[in-house]
Every structure is written in C-alpha cells, then in structure tokens.
C-alpha cells in the first residue's frame, strides 16, 4: 500500500467513526482541526506534502459526492496547471500577491502553490464558514501561509490591492440585491449574475498593473449591454483562452480563462489574445500554445 493510500484510509477511518448522524463533510472538517498535536505531527512528519494534498483531494471528493451540491464542485487540477503556466509566463519567479475571491475548499490555491515555481503571497476569500475552517486546517497541514478571509467576496474587503486575482467564478445569481446595487454590472431588474459582479470586484482590487485571471462560463462574455459598456469604459479584456472541449459534457458548459486589467496598464498588450488550449495530453500542441502566448506578451 502506498503512503498516499495509507494516509487516505487512516483519515477516512477516523472521519467515518466520528460521523455519527452528521455528514462526512462536517466530520472531515472537525477531524482535520487536529487539536491533538500528536495526530498533527503524525501526519506532517510521516507523509509528504504531495501525499497530504492528494489525500485531501480524495477525501474532499468523497465528502462532496455525499453532499451532491453542484455549488461545492472543485476546480480541476488541470485548470490550475494552465493558470500556473500563464502566471509563470507573466511573472517568472517574482514575488507577487495572489488572491482567490471564490476559494471554496482552497483546492485552486493549494494546486497553484504546489504546481508553480513562483513565490506567492496568498489570500483566500470565501463566504462559507465550513470551507474557511477546512482551508485553515489543510493549509496548516501543508505548512503553507495563507490569509483566509471568511466573508462574502462581493462586500468590501480589508485587503491591499493585488498583483493577481484568480477565481473559478460562480455562475449563479447573487442573492443580496441591495449589495448588488453597488456594482455597475448589476442587473436592471431582479437578481444579478455572480459572474459579472465577480469580474467587477476583481478589477476593484487589482493594483494598477495587476491582472485578473478568471475562469468563467464562456456565455458570460456574450451577455448584457452593460458588460460591453464596462469593457469599453472601465477595464481591458486582454485575453480569452477557451478550455479544451473534452473537459465539458456539452457546449453550454464551456468555460474560458479570461485576463482582465485596468485601463492605462502596461503589463499586457491591449490587442486581445484569443486561443483555445489544446488538451494537456497533446504535448506539442500545448507547447505551441505557450509559445504563442509568450509571443503575444512580447508585443506590449
């Protein structure tokens, strides 16, 4: 049995035993608090960071399968891989601040911090209290320093302006109609789309040369007139990178990585970069995509 399997079954056994009438997810959150130092060091001293990360992902998948709640889906690691490569092209190994405004389980930031060679100052924002607790626990086990903010990311945030804001942007509707009125991209009537408000909020917290790297449903880009006006007057849409077709069951679920910046920025070319990422299994095609992206960057 591999170390990964040993760790998974060790934690899974305890979580199942402690679950009682509650959910596996709640039991996992409680167990990973590891208030007993002996339990904590038993994991940290005997298992690699990679095994801890993978075990967490498998445990989380089991927990989310039981909950059967689409809003609790996690960002696939391959998407984080694409974004980590984009950030390496943009920043090489510079120290930069990176915030995720819809961090959920923390999986996006976990993968980014382990896949990338960059030196990142990380901030995680999520409204869900259980997810915030879960993140605190797993980042503690991974010995990764992350500022975790448990609040609605669409409310005012007490953070500095960021070099990079990433998010796998939620697509549903935002329930707080009063707060949505603070946004230019709020709907003229009824509930506003989360995705549009997240794009605007990301722009609000970017520094002058910061870059928003957001995963959005592609149909968001084909929506309301106020979004087109916002693009003309308030931000730049610098790149639309469509994810591989094979990742989605049908065209309506298609997602893209978009890069946004503030007006008057000098980090990215103003000419929009349009591309579709080849499957990561197509090594030659993927290498060509990265080369095209680097060539585009050199045009600024």
Model-derived features with residue positions:
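Mobile active-site "lid"/loop adjacent to the S-adenosyl-L-methionine
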Residues: 169-198
